A protein has these predicted regions:
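Nucleic-acid endo/exonuclease domains
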Residues: 1-196
Length: 196
């Protein structure tokens, strides 16, 4: 079931559901230890993997410089008690650059979302954001660093969950109804929110 990926009510319902389920949610968290500059990871266990992905993004369209900030910008939601970071992804996250990054993740990388479905969405949606011209590579790189946060700052983050917007009509759920809360929990644990 496809739906408008920019439906503001969907995002509001997701947030309301999460606030209903968890007591300790931080909105728009920032992790200062999460640098987006590759050289800051030299000597760490993630450096080789990140270097391979970064190089693949540089080679994708020949754009070499797409990192313009020091650290990751704010994320969507963080549940400190569970050490879970939650990202809600609109269509602009499903690009060829993101597919290039995902295809270069190390074998055995543990995802907390269905990466194969995510790759399929990149192929199908092929979103493009050329303003500025490096934006697709930049977003793909920042998403990559977020995916690696459990390795970068394991004392704060155990997993990163990505919820694709537009794959389910979240706006039809009511956070005040127990049956909808139960349905929301089930959807988050299943793959039915992903386009087949």
């Amino acid at each position: 079931m496809s739906h408008d990926c920019r439906c503001n009510k969907c995002k509001s319902v997701i947030y309301a559901m999460l606030f209903r389920i968890y007591d300790d949610i931080e909105f728009k968290p920032k992790f200062d230890e999460a640098s987006v500059h590759l050289e800051n990871y030299e000597g760490t266990k993630v450096y080789r993997s990140l270097r391979k992905i970064y190089k693949a993004l540089q080679d994708y369209r020949g754009i070499k410089h797409f990192v313009k900030v020091k650290n990751l910008c704010q994320s969507d939601l963080y549940i400190p008690s569970k050490k879970i970071l939650i990202e809600t992804d609109e269509s602009q996250h499903f690009t060829e650059a993101r597919l290039e990054a995902l295809n270069n993740y190390p074998k055995g990388f543990i995802f907390s979302y269905n990466v194969n479905a995510y790759k399929q969405m990149c192929v199908k949606i092929k979103s493009k954001d050329r303003d500025p011209k490096y934006r697709d590579e930049q977003r793909a790189w920042y998403d990559t660093v977020r995916d690696f946060l459990p390795q970068i700052c394991p004392t704060k983050i155990k997993k990163v969950i990505r919820i694709p917007l537009g794959e389910f009509k979240w706006c039809e759920l009511n956070h005040k109804k127990e049956e909808d809360v139960a349905k929301f929990k089930k959807l988050l644990k299943s793959e039915c929110i992903w386009r087949k």
